């Protein structure tokens, strides 16, 4: 089994991902969704965590071999980023969603320098907005952001367009298409539910109709 399928299976097994097309979840945006993802759960499972961190290292070495600092997004990207930086013997920093309103007002915590080549770690890509704000924060300090690496993406068109417009490569360990295929093969969903899940990816507002 390749890495993308293996990680998709792990996410389903440990219930980091729930698929519920007939009883959709409500996202913070108000969107009714057949999927809910909480990749923080992966940190509680050592074997899953190791599989993910080794996957991150492999993808970074393959796609961004010139990296010289790892950053995590606050908060979900911090633990993964710190482990990866340790495995790769690289400096680590993390990026807040906004600058602190006290102290020295840092948005990036850790020692960073203009000219560094950074890879940013995220756990989940939905619209891509929050991690691309982290990219902008790093770039504003003269850092070259080589790309973003995440555990999982919903593969929404809005996110893919946002990364293209920002000219930032996105690499993920697994993705929505892979996950729903694995879910069907392993009996997590029925054929009818698979149809609904595919419709959601294409049209988040009208997939239930």
Swiss-Prot record:
What function does this protein fulfil? Catalyzes the transfer of a ribosyl phosphate group from 5-phosphoribose 1-diphosphate to orotate, leading to the formation of orotidine monophosphate (OMP).
According to the record's subunit comment, the protein's assembly and interactions are:
Homodimer.
Q: Which InterPro entries match?
A: OPRT (IPR023031), Or_phspho_trans_dom (IPR004467), PRibTrfase_dom (IPR000836), PRTase-like (IPR029057)
What UniProt keywords are attached to this protein's entry? Glycosyltransferase, Magnesium, Pyrimidine biosynthesis, Transferase
State the source organism's domain of life. Bacteria
HAMAP family found in the cross-reference section: PyrE
Q: Can you tell me which family this protein belongs to?
A: Belongs to the purine/pyrimidine phosphoribosyltransferase family. PyrE subfamily.
Keyword RNA-binding, does the record have it? no
The keyword Iron-sulfur is annotated on this UniProt entry: no
Positions bound to 5-phospho-alpha-D-ribose 1-diphosphate: 96, 100, 102, 122-130
**EC number, as in UniProt:** 2.4.2.10
Q: What name does UniProt use for this protein?
A: Orotate phosphoribosyltransferase
User: Which pathway does it operate in?
Assistant: Pyrimidine metabolism; UMP biosynthesis via de novo pathway; UMP from orotate: step 1/2
Q: Which cofactor does it need?
A: Mg(2+)
Q: Which gene encodes it?
A: pyrE
What chemistry does it catalyse, as a reaction equation? orotidine 5'-phosphate + diphosphate = orotate + 5-phospho-alpha-D-ribose 1-diphosphate
Q: Which residues bind orotate?
A: 126
Listed GO MF terms: magnesium ion binding; orotate phosphoribosyltransferase activity
PROSITE patterns per the UniProt record, alphabetical: PUR_PYR_PR_TRANSFER (PS00103)
What biological-process GO terms show up in the record?
'de novo' UMP biosynthetic process; pyrimidine nucleobase biosynthetic process
């Amino acid at each position: 089994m390749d890495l993308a399928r293996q990680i998709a299976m792990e996410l389903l097994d440990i219930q980091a991902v729930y698929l519920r097309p007939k009883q959709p979840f409500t996202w913070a945006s108000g969107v009714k969704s057949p999927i809910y993802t909480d990749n923080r759960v992966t940190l509680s499972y050592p074997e899953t965590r190791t599989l993910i961190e080794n996957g991150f290292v492999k993808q970074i070495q393959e796609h961004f071999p010139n990296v010289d600092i790892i950053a995590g997004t606050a908060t979900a990207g911090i633990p993964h980023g710190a482990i990866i930086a340790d495995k790769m013997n690289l400096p680590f920093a993390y990026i807040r969603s906004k600058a602190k309103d006290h102290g020295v007002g840092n948005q990036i915590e850790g020692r960073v320098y203009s000219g560094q080549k950074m890879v940013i770690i995220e756990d989940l890509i939905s619209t891509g907005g929050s991690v691309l704000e982290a990219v902008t924060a790093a770039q504003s300090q003269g850092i070259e952001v080589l790309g973003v690496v995440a555990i999982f993406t919903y593969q929404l068109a809005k996110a893919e367009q946002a990364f293209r417009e920002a000219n930032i490569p996105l690499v993920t360990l697994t993705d929505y298409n892979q996950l729903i295929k694995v879910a069907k093969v392993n009996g997590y969903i029925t054929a009818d539910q698979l149809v609904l899940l595919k419709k959601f990816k294409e049209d988040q507002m009208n997939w239930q109709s």
